[in-house]
Amino acid sequence: MSNSVRPAVKLTGIRKNFGLLEVLHGVSLTANQGEVISILGSSGSGKSTLLRCVNMLEVPNSGSVSIMGEEIALNHRSGHPSRPKYPKQVNRLRERAAMVFQSFHLWSHLTILQNVMEAPLHVQRRDRKECHAEAEALLERVGIASKRNAFPSELSGGQQQRAAIARALAMRPEVLLFDEPTSALDPELVGEVLRVMRNLAAEGRTMLIVTHEMDFARDVSSRSVFLHQGVIAEEGLSSEMFANPRTERFRQFLRRDGAASH
């Protein structure tokens, strides 16, 4: 299968338990290359768990995960936690599907420039000069080049999240995963992060985004997926879903979030 038609991410029959509680009930989702998919839902719907299953931060109890056509080999054993068969495969595929977290996860003892350089230099073992030049360019791109020598504690939340996006991009991933990237930000800082994400979407990046930003989901995402109680209750083109919700569950969700179509 050629790269032009190979899905970037394919989740099939994903089930995930935490103890006796099953939070995902056989969810299947395919993201094609260049698609921006927003994953929507109320708290506890399973949306962040689903995203974390993509790069094995949560290991599904059953089902399969493929990234760029390569399936992650898993050991599913009845009565036992599932685990990847080959940790090296997971580490390699995490470079292809980079995660941006709600809480930034920057190294507090490193400068912003060092944070962006860290993984390319020490995980991918790329040339230091190359890593430095690319990190500088990425910080310029997300609008915080002047903060290159600052430490995370010296930055606003929005600046820290933009640094986290630059750090993810430094791995040269084929897929970007965003887990509620604006939820921890003060309202006045949300826009600067969403602008960076809009620019990435305009470049044709493959992005899976768990978000409560309904305007962003409607205007930027090519498709949206609405999770309710661990299953996909509605999915489709974002423009169509927001203009004409097919299910009462999604209509209620939009009304509650103040995101009625316009």
UniProtKB/Swiss-Prot annotation:
Task: Identify its protein family.
Answer: Belongs to the ABC transporter superfamily.
InterPro entries, from UniProt? AAA+_ATPase (IPR003593), ABC_ATPase_HisP-typ (IPR030679), ABC_transporter-like_ATP-bd (IPR003439), ABC_transporter-like_CS (IPR017871), MetN_ABC_transporter-like (IPR050086), P-loop_NTPase (IPR027417)
Please report the name of this protein according to its UniProt entry: Octopine permease ATP-binding protein P
GO terms under cellular component: plasma membrane
Pfam families the record matches: ABC_tran
Which PANTHER family does this chain map to? AMINO ACID IMPORT ATP-BINDING PROTEIN, L-CYSTINE IMPORT ATP-BINDING PROTEIN TCYN
- List residues binding ATP: G41, S42, S43, G44, S45, G46, K47, S48
Occurrences of domain ABC transporter (ranges): 9-254
Q: Where in the cell is it found?
A: Cell inner membrane
Gene name on record? occP
Q: Which SMART domains match?
A: AAA
Keywords of the record: ATP-binding, Cell inner membrane, Cell membrane, Membrane, Nucleotide-binding, Transport
Q: Which organism is it from?
A: Rhizobium meliloti
> What's the domain of life for this entry?
Bacteria
Which GO molecular function annotations are given, in alphabetical order? ABC-type amino acid transporter activity; ATP binding; ATP hydrolysis activity
Looking at the keywords, is Cell wall biogenesis/degradation present?
no
